């Protein structure tokens, strides 16, 4: 199985450190990049339009962030997705237990799951093995 690249889009710097260390410790992915909001991640995606190998395979996307939240990011991703030659899958990560967020996540075709914070090693193993 080829290891995949993963991006984490979340405004919590402590969570970013924890998930980064966990991913590195268990060696589940070939590379990890972190972004503090959807706008910065979207800009990075746009810069990589001509370089599919540098695009992420998986995005862990937090919903509630400043500048551009997770839902706004998903709307923008939907607009640029046809330009990618690579399939990018998204997992929503949330501390919210709101049913409407879970239901909304099901309306996006490239959202494969909804995970509660904190993301566990088992969650990451499952993601790495199914994508």
Each language-model region and where it sits:
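Short amphipathic alpha-helix used as the core "switch/output" element in two-component signaling
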Residues: 71-84
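Helix N-cap/capping motif at the beta->alpha junctions
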Residues: 34-47, 70
